[in-house]
Amino acid sequence: MTDLKTWGQALDYTIKTRDEWQPHRKGSKPAITYATHFSNYNPQGRRFLIKDFNKAMMETYISELRVYRELADQTLNHCIQNIQTVLNHCIDMGVLAYQNNRHKWITGEGKFKFTKLRLTKQPRITLSPAQVDQFYAAAKNCFNQESLADTVMLSAWTGLGWAEFSQLTPSDIHLDAPVPFIAVGEREGFTLKTTHRKRRIYLPSGSDGYNKLMPILSRNLESCTDPEIQIFGDLFTSQDAHRVKFNDVRDYLQLDEKLTPYCLRHTFNTWLANLDVHPAKAHKMMGHASMKTTMEYYTHINDDQVIEAYSRLTAAA
């Protein structure tokens, strides 16, 4: 077999021939997913030339995944590792030549070795309920962006990110149920990041979530003429377009420039932690694959919250 030229060729070859990536092997699916991110999110896609891999290109790619796809550093390291795995597997199999080891991203053996990110605990940017209300009002009244305002309120009070709320159709919204709920991942064709993301978002009558979201959901359902149309996703051309409008309001309100739409999902989990919702319940409500991810929100409790918890202790506890 002649030397491979493009990323797509290398990826296909690795998926076909690498034993660790076969369907029966544990970890094969996420490894392929992380590697495939490069096909989806670099401008040339699968046609990207292997000869063009270098340090500067990888840093740009990872920066864009972090900023525009809002991936965590640990996830980004998985992406780096599995790009490297694809390229080095092809070298090991003799279908890709050893590389020029004068470059810093090439080992002495002529294989690829890209620098991974140093994992540091980043402070989470979150909003208070009052700030969410302020954001909603500014988006709706100052920018005439009611659709943006709706998604901000929805995300903050449900923990739904773009990938989930942009897929919602009328069939996912059950306002006439004894306890109204939003079904996430129950409908055929609803794409989930992991199976853990399949869940129901309940809106108990009289709760703040109910009072905030019922008018929004009812209004959007009434304006939906097609039961298969995406209630919120069709209001924006893309996730990037949604983010641009979000950033306009964020900057107008002089909020932290690191605040992104995905921070509203962090906001929801932080509210749960601040209200002492049991971690097991929060884990299910968020749809996290790992309890460790949920527990990270419970390690950012400040002294005032600890004091308030002590104040609730009684002899009847």
Predicted features and spans:
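Basic/aromatic-enriched alpha-helical hairpins
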Residues: 2-70
